[in-house]
Amino acid sequence: MNGTQGLMEALSKTKTKRFKVKHPKRKLFRCNDPLLGVFMWGVNHTVRELQHIHVPVMLMPDDFRSFSKITIKNHAYNKENLPSNFKVKEYCPLVFRNLRERFGINDSDFLKSLTVPPRSINPLRGGANYYLSADRLYVIKTLTTEEVEEMHHFLKQYHPYIVDRHAKTLLPQYLALYRLTVDNMESYMVVIRNVFSAHLKVHKKYDLKGSRVDREASDKEREKTCPTLKDNDFLADGVKINIGEEGKEGLMETLGADVDFLSKLNIIGYSLLLGIHDMDRAMEDALDAQAEEEEDDEDYDSAGSGGVALTPPESPNTRRKISSSMMVSQASRIDPNLDIYAIPSRAAGAGAGTVSGPKHIYFLSIMDVLTHYGIKKAAAKAAKTVKYGSDVEGISTAEPEQYSRRFLAFVNDAIE
C-alpha cells in the first residue's frame, strides 16, 4: 500500500506539458466596401475551386463560353464581414487560368495579392472605378455591360494571339473577369497586371494616342500629384523615349504586331500608357529622406542621450548611413520578375558615365483595347470632321487602319 501511495505521489509531482490547440486561420475578407469584400471572397473561392479541376491539354470552344456561379445566402452569420446575400460569377475560368500561367503568374501568389483589401486609385479614364492590390501588382477595373460583351468577343482572339506570341506583348494582361451581385446591384470587374512597378515611383505619366485634337490634360487633372498628361503635353515637354536603336527595334516589333492584331479586329481608341521613373530624382528623394532621419537623430541625441557620446562603431547614425547608402544604390533597380513592362534608357542601362542622356526607366503598355469601330464610332468621326475639318490625322476617332498607322508613326518618332 505504501508503495502504491509513493507511486501516486511521484506521478502527482511530475510536470505535464500542456498543449494549446491551434485553430487554422480563417480569412475574413473584412473591408469597409461590401463590394470589395465580396470580390476578395470570390477570388478566394474561384481560385481554390480551380485547384481541384484537371488542367486540359488544350482549350475548347466551350471554355470561352463557360462560367462558374455561386449564390450565398446567410442568416445572422458572418454578417460583420460580408453581406448576407451575394452572388459571384467568374467568366471563362479555364481560359483565364491558362492566361495567368502563360504570363508567369502562380495562382497561389495571385490569391495572396487579391485577398487583402485593395485601395481605390485615381481613374485614368472617366466612368470606371479603379483599385490597386495591396502589393501594387494588379489593377482591378470596373466594366460596363457593353465592355463585358466586347471582352467575350475579344478573348476568343486574344488567347490564341498570346499563345502564338509566347506572351511577348504590350497588350493588357487580362487575368480574371467577374460579375458580383451585392444588394441586387451587378458590378463587373476585370483584373489586369499593373503596368507600373510596385517599388519604383513613376514621376511622369502620359496617355498617348498619336492624335492632336483635344489631347491635353485638363486643369483638374494637372492638380494631381502625378497627372496623366496627353499627346500635346508630351510634345510640348519635348520628351523622347531614349532607348537606342536596338531597344527601339525590339519595342517597335512588339508594338507593330500588337497594333496589327487590333487593327484586324477593327479596334480603335487604344493608347500607349507611358510611365517615367527618373533615377536621379529618386536618388535625390532617397538622400533627402536620409538627411531628415539624421536630423531627427541629432535632435534625439542632444535632448535624450545625456551627453554620452557613442563610439563610431556603436553609433546608430553610422549604421544608418551605411544602410541608407545601400538603399540609394538599390533605389532604381529593375526586378525582371515583376517589372515586366520596364525598359531602361541608354544612360540607365550603361555603366556609370559611359553614355550621356537621361537616366530613366520607362514603363510602356497598350491600354483600352475594347473599343470596336462600328456605327457609333463612324458617326463620332463624321461629327468631329464637321467640327474640326477633314484633317483625319488630327482626330482621335479614325478608321482602324488610319488609327493604327498614325499611332505607330507617333510612337516611332518619340523613340530615339
Positions of PLM-derived features:
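Active-site-proximal segments of catalytic enzyme domains
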Residues: 107-175
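Residue-level recognition of beta-strand microenvironments
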Residues: 177-179
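Long, low-complexity eukaryotic regulatory regions
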Residues: 1-128, 162, 171, 181-416
